[in-house]
């Protein structure tokens, strides 16, 4: 079942984030992750965390965060992370479509995401769900 994550899920979600970071070779800082997750688990002000629960265990998660843009015509969102333990099971597709529907019901007009340019498999997955490569280039700067 897919449901909203709660503070009671924090430990299991952090474990899933660790697995995601390990699989994708991203740095993992459990304190930073916990500090970022807590506000999302408390209310909808910054976004939502969705989890797949099977027999009392979490087997996947998705994080959607809110933004606002003139170009989008109002509220937009970023699919910040999505991860499922069982690849090729259909769970990733189910979770992605669920988050799209939920974001739409919360008034989001666009959903954005980013993935590594070389990851053709994942890019194909997102393309099958209607995501398109844009001509724009995102730049970032740490404000820490």
Regions found by a protein language model. Name each.
Residues 84, 89-101, 128:
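Conserved acetyl-CoA-binding loop-helix of GNAT-fold acetyltransferases
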Residues 126-136:
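Conserved acetyl-CoA-binding loop of GNAT-fold acetyltransferases
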Residues 74-86:
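Conserved acetyl-CoA binding element of GNAT-fold acetyltransferases
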Residues 67, 85-87, 116:
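Residue-level recognition of the GNAT/N-acetyltransferase active site
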Residues 5, 82-84, 115:
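Hydrophobic adenine-recognition pocket in adenosine-nucleotide-binding enzymes
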Residues 104-115:
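Conserved GNAT acetyl-CoA-binding A-motif
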Residues 4-11, 15-74, 96-97, 102, ...:
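Acetyl-CoA-dependent GNAT
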Residues 113-128:
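Low-complexity, intrinsically disordered Gly/Pro/Thr-rich segments
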């Amino acid at each position: 079942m897919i449901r909203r994550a709660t503070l009671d899920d924090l430990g299991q979600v952090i474990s899933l984030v660790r697995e995601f970071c390990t699989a994708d070779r991203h740095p993992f800082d459990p304190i930073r992750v916990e500090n970022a997750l807590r506000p999302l688990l408390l209310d909808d002000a910054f976004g939502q965390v969705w989890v797949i629960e099977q027999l009392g265990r979490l087997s996947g998660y998705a994080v959607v965060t809110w933004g606002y843009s003139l170009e989008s015509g109002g509220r937009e969102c970023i699919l910040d992370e999505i991860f499922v333990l069982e690849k090729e099971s259909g769970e990733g597709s189910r979770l992605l479509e669920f988050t799209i529907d939920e974001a739409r019901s919360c008034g989001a007009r666009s959903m954005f995401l980013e993935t590594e340019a070389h990851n053709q498999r994942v890019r194909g997955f997102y393309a099958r769900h209607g995501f398109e490569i844009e001509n724009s280039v995102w730049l970032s700067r740490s404000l820490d």
